[in-house]
Amino acid sequence: MKDLLIKYGYDKTENISNEWNYVKGWTDEFPYTIQQIHGIKGAIVTMSTMCIAQRTSLDMLMYYDTRPSTFNGVFDFYTAKPLKGYYAFYWYGMFYDMRAEIRAVNEIENIYSLCGVDENGKVLAIVTHYSDNDNTENRTISVDFGKSGEYEIYLLDEKHNGELVQITDKLEFDMKVHSAILIKEK
Protein backbone atom coordinates (compact mmCIF):
# COMPACT_ATOMS: atom_id res chain seq x y z
CA MET A 1 0.00 0.00 0.00
CA LYS A 2 2.82 2.42 0.88
CA ASP A 3 4.30 1.89 -2.61
CA LEU A 4 0.99 2.94 -4.19
CA LEU A 5 0.81 6.04 -2.02
CA ILE A 6 4.33 7.01 -3.05
CA LYS A 7 3.70 6.20 -6.73
CA TYR A 8 0.76 8.61 -6.85
CA GLY A 9 2.47 11.42 -4.96
CA TYR A 10 1.21 10.75 -1.45
CA ASP A 11 4.58 9.99 0.12
CA LYS A 12 3.78 12.09 3.21
CA THR A 13 0.40 10.41 3.76
CA GLU A 14 -0.10 8.17 6.78
CA ASN A 15 -0.94 4.58 5.91
CA ILE A 16 -3.80 3.64 8.26
CA SER A 17 -5.92 0.49 8.42
CA ASN A 18 -9.02 1.83 10.12
CA GLU A 19 -11.99 0.08 11.73
CA TRP A 20 -10.91 -3.54 11.30
CA ASN A 21 -12.23 -6.59 13.12
CA TYR A 22 -13.23 -10.18 12.36
CA VAL A 23 -16.10 -10.39 9.85
CA LYS A 24 -17.27 -13.66 8.34
CA GLY A 25 -20.15 -11.96 6.55
CA TRP A 26 -22.72 -9.18 6.80
CA THR A 27 -25.93 -11.14 6.12
CA ASP A 28 -26.58 -14.77 7.10
CA GLU A 29 -23.14 -15.06 8.72
CA PHE A 30 -23.45 -11.89 10.81
CA PRO A 31 -24.65 -13.61 14.04
CA TYR A 32 -21.66 -15.99 13.75
CA THR A 33 -19.39 -12.97 13.23
CA ILE A 34 -20.52 -11.30 16.46
CA GLN A 35 -20.20 -14.52 18.46
CA GLN A 36 -16.64 -14.97 17.24
CA ILE A 37 -15.59 -11.37 17.92
CA HIS A 38 -16.40 -11.94 21.61
CA GLY A 39 -14.59 -15.28 21.86
CA ILE A 40 -11.26 -16.92 21.20
CA LYS A 41 -11.49 -16.78 17.40
CA GLY A 42 -11.89 -13.01 17.48
CA ALA A 43 -8.98 -12.70 19.90
CA ILE A 44 -6.70 -14.79 17.69
CA VAL A 45 -7.74 -12.84 14.57
CA THR A 46 -6.81 -9.67 16.46
CA MET A 47 -3.44 -11.01 17.63
CA SER A 48 -2.61 -12.50 14.21
CA THR A 49 -3.49 -9.22 12.50
CA MET A 50 -1.18 -7.31 14.84
CA CYS A 51 1.64 -9.78 14.11
CA ILE A 52 1.16 -9.39 10.35
CA ALA A 53 0.77 -5.61 10.47
CA GLN A 54 4.02 -5.22 12.40
CA ARG A 55 5.88 -6.38 9.27
CA THR A 56 4.14 -3.92 6.93
CA SER A 57 4.42 -0.23 6.14
CA LEU A 58 1.27 0.59 8.14
CA ASP A 59 1.57 3.64 10.34
CA MET A 60 -1.54 2.83 12.40
CA LEU A 61 -3.78 -0.18 12.89
CA MET A 62 -7.11 0.97 14.34
CA TYR A 63 -9.21 -1.80 15.92
CA TYR A 64 -12.98 -1.46 15.77
CA ASP A 65 -14.20 -1.17 18.50
CA THR A 66 -13.63 -0.82 22.25
CA ARG A 67 -16.73 1.27 22.86
CA PRO A 68 -19.67 -0.65 24.38
CA SER A 69 -20.90 -2.24 21.16
CA THR A 70 -21.31 -5.61 19.47
CA PHE A 71 -17.90 -5.19 17.81
CA ASN A 72 -16.08 -4.81 21.13
CA GLY A 73 -14.10 -8.02 21.56
CA VAL A 74 -11.95 -6.58 24.34
CA PHE A 75 -14.37 -5.92 27.21
CA ASP A 76 -17.74 -7.41 28.12
CA PHE A 77 -20.58 -5.05 27.22
CA TYR A 78 -22.32 -5.35 30.60
CA THR A 79 -19.58 -6.05 33.14
CA ALA A 80 -16.57 -4.35 31.48
CA LYS A 81 -14.55 -7.46 32.39
CA PRO A 82 -11.84 -8.52 29.93
CA LEU A 83 -12.80 -10.83 27.07
CA LYS A 84 -10.32 -13.06 25.23
CA GLY A 85 -9.45 -10.17 22.89
CA TYR A 86 -8.10 -8.16 25.81
CA TYR A 87 -5.04 -10.42 25.96
CA ALA A 88 -4.10 -9.67 22.35
CA PHE A 89 -3.77 -5.98 23.24
CA TYR A 90 -2.14 -6.68 26.61
CA TRP A 91 0.49 -8.94 25.05
CA TYR A 92 1.12 -6.59 22.13
CA GLY A 93 1.64 -3.75 24.60
CA MET A 94 4.58 -5.64 26.10
CA PHE A 95 6.50 -5.08 22.87
CA TYR A 96 6.73 -1.34 23.51
CA ASP A 97 9.47 -2.25 26.02
CA MET A 98 11.48 -4.13 23.40
CA ARG A 99 14.61 -2.60 21.90
CA ALA A 100 14.37 -4.36 18.51
CA GLU A 101 12.19 -6.69 16.48
CA ILE A 102 13.43 -10.13 15.47
CA ARG A 103 11.92 -11.32 12.20
CA ALA A 104 10.93 -14.95 11.68
CA VAL A 105 12.97 -16.81 9.08
CA ASN A 106 10.23 -19.25 8.08
CA GLU A 107 6.62 -18.60 7.22
CA ILE A 108 4.19 -21.41 8.02
CA GLU A 109 0.60 -21.44 6.78
CA ASN A 110 -1.82 -20.22 9.49
CA ILE A 111 1.01 -19.49 11.95
CA TYR A 112 1.76 -15.85 12.76
CA SER A 113 4.46 -14.48 15.03
CA LEU A 114 5.98 -11.40 16.55
CA CYS A 115 9.30 -11.36 18.38
CA GLY A 116 11.39 -8.74 20.12
CA VAL A 117 14.46 -8.42 22.29
CA ASP A 118 14.85 -6.06 25.23
CA GLU A 119 17.88 -4.01 26.30
CA ASN A 120 19.19 -7.00 28.31
CA GLY A 121 19.01 -9.36 25.32
CA LYS A 122 15.92 -11.16 26.68
CA VAL A 123 13.45 -12.43 24.10
CA LEU A 124 9.68 -11.97 24.01
CA ALA A 125 7.62 -13.69 21.31
CA ILE A 126 4.02 -14.36 20.36
CA VAL A 127 2.99 -17.24 18.13
CA THR A 128 -0.62 -17.63 16.96
CA HIS A 129 -2.45 -20.36 15.06
CA TYR A 130 -5.37 -18.91 13.12
CA SER A 131 -7.55 -20.19 10.29
CA ASP A 132 -11.06 -19.18 9.34
CA ASN A 133 -11.75 -22.92 9.11
CA ASP A 134 -12.77 -23.90 12.65
CA ASN A 135 -11.87 -27.55 11.92
CA THR A 136 -8.23 -26.89 11.07
CA GLU A 137 -5.94 -29.48 12.64
CA ASN A 138 -3.35 -28.75 15.31
CA ARG A 139 0.08 -27.57 14.17
CA THR A 140 3.34 -28.54 15.81
CA ILE A 141 5.78 -25.66 15.76
CA SER A 142 9.34 -25.24 16.97
CA VAL A 143 10.89 -21.92 17.92
CA ASP A 144 14.65 -21.40 17.76
CA PHE A 145 16.07 -18.16 19.13
CA GLY A 146 19.64 -19.29 18.43
CA LYS A 147 20.44 -19.59 22.11
CA SER A 148 19.47 -21.78 25.03
CA GLY A 149 17.50 -20.43 27.92
CA GLU A 150 14.55 -20.85 30.21
CA TYR A 151 11.22 -19.49 29.05
CA GLU A 152 7.85 -18.76 30.61
CA ILE A 153 5.00 -19.94 28.37
CA TYR A 154 1.63 -18.20 28.57
CA LEU A 155 -1.41 -19.60 26.78
CA LEU A 156 -4.47 -17.97 25.26
CA ASP A 157 -7.06 -20.44 24.04
CA GLU A 158 -10.63 -21.51 24.73
CA LYS A 159 -9.73 -22.58 28.30
CA HIS A 160 -6.86 -20.22 29.21
CA ASN A 161 -6.83 -16.45 29.54
CA GLY A 162 -3.21 -15.63 28.87
CA GLU A 163 -1.98 -17.39 31.97
CA LEU A 164 1.39 -18.99 32.70
CA VAL A 165 1.16 -22.69 31.85
CA GLN A 166 4.79 -23.79 32.04
CA ILE A 167 8.44 -22.85 32.37
CA THR A 168 10.64 -24.73 29.92
CA ASP A 169 13.81 -24.79 27.87
CA LYS A 170 12.07 -26.79 25.10
CA LEU A 171 10.35 -24.60 22.54
CA GLU A 172 8.21 -27.08 20.65
CA PHE A 173 4.45 -26.67 20.86
CA ASP A 174 1.33 -28.46 19.64
CA MET A 175 -0.98 -25.56 18.86
CA LYS A 176 -4.73 -25.86 18.44
CA VAL A 177 -6.38 -23.62 15.88
CA HIS A 178 -7.44 -20.35 17.50
CA SER A 179 -4.72 -20.33 20.11
CA ALA A 180 -1.72 -18.17 20.95
CA ILE A 181 1.34 -18.49 23.12
CA LEU A 182 3.50 -15.82 24.64
CA ILE A 183 7.11 -16.89 25.14
CA LYS A 184 9.02 -14.80 27.68
CA GLU A 185 12.68 -15.43 28.42
CA LYS A 186 13.45 -15.56 32.14
What are the residue ranges of the model-derived segments?
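Short helix-capping segments at alpha-helix termini
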Residues: 6-11
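Aromatic/acidic polysaccharide-binding cleft in carbohydrate-active enzymes
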Residues: 17-113, 119
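Carbohydrate-binding surface patches
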Residues: 107-147, 178
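Solvent-exposed beta-hairpin/edge-strand motifs
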Residues: 144-160
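Short beta-strand and strand-turn-strand segments in soluble, beta-rich domains
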Residues: 161-167
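C-terminal beta-strand-rich structural cap/linker in extracellular carbohydrate-active enzymes
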Residues: 167-186
